[in-house]
Design a protein with these regions (language model features):
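Bacterial Sec-dependent N-terminal signal peptides
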Residues: 1-27
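Alpha-helical cap/lid subdomain in secreted, periplasmic
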Residues: 2-6, 25, 52-62, 78-228
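Serine-esterase "nucleophile elbow" of acetyl-processing enzymes
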Residues: 17-72, 77, 82-91
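Hydrophobic alpha-helical membrane context
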Residues: 15-18, 47, 191, 216
Length: 228
């Protein structure tokens, strides 16, 4: 390759690299931090996948980079223990925390849930670390463990209690709240006329089906799109 062609090739390569760098610099990195519900969200049809497709369709994919950081079985203290590697080191602009189902559910299934006071303590510790790095935060209430609308799901009481903890944290820490607990109940009241335990927004009382993923995507995007 002659010298002029080498210079032209180098110039084009540098231009492409610089343009790519500028595009990456302009993107808001959003990390979704949670348990198996978040882990499944990156799969086809999951709410992170749906959001990526929505961003592309709206021409907003140049503005956002979405990344899932969900691990099956995680509870609040698991998030605290792995947040350095899975969140902070990746330098996100926005973090969406969706946790709490296992903290309640595992009390019943294996006796390894999280007491309410410890749940709040670990949650606040996570918030403190994220704020220290000037990361924007939105937090979600745990949606459902059973979809019945007459408050006869066995763990409704605990889910409401932990959801209220999260609502209080959002208010006291001036954070964006994505109230999935309220959104799921409202949807089920309108659409679950047979008072079914599952099959409306979940496949198994907890994990999301197609309609559940769409609802979570819609509710999360309402908040993410408003974060500057």
């Amino acid at each position: 390759m002659s010298k002029p062609f080498k210079l032209i090739f180098l110039s084009i390569t540098l231009t492409i690299l610089f343009t790519s760098f500028l595009l990456m610099q302009g993107k808001k990195k959003v990390i979704f931090f949670g348990d198996s519900i978040t882990q499944a969200a990156i799969k086809p049809g999951g709410y992170i996948d749906l959001m990526n497709k929505m961003l592309i369709s709206k021409g907003l994919d140049k503005d956002y980079e979405l990344e899932g950081a969900g691990v099956s079985g995680n509870k609040i203290y698991d998030l605290y223990l792995r947040m350095e590697e899975d969140v902070l080191m990746k330098k996100p602009d926005i973090v969406i925390i969706y946790i709490g189902v296992n903290d309640v559910w595992h009390k019943q299934t294996s006796g390894t849930g999280t007491d309410a006071d410890k749940f709040q303590k670990f949650y606040l510790a996570i918030i403190k670390k994220l704020k220290k790095d000037n990361i924007k935060i939105a937090i979600c209430t745990p949606a459902v463990i059973g979809e019945k609308t007459d408050y006869s799901n066995q763990l409704d009481g605990d889910l409401n209690k932990y959801s209220n903890i999260i609502r209080s944290i959002a208010k006291n820490e001036n954070l964006q709240l994505i109230d999935l607990r309220a959104s799921f109940l409202q949807y089920n009241i309108s659409n679950n006329t047979e008072n079914k335990e599952l099959g409306v927004l979940t496949s198994d009382r907890v994990h999301l089906n197609e309609a559940g993923n769409k609802l979570v995507n819609d509710e999360m995007w309402k908040v993410i799109s408003e974060i500057k």
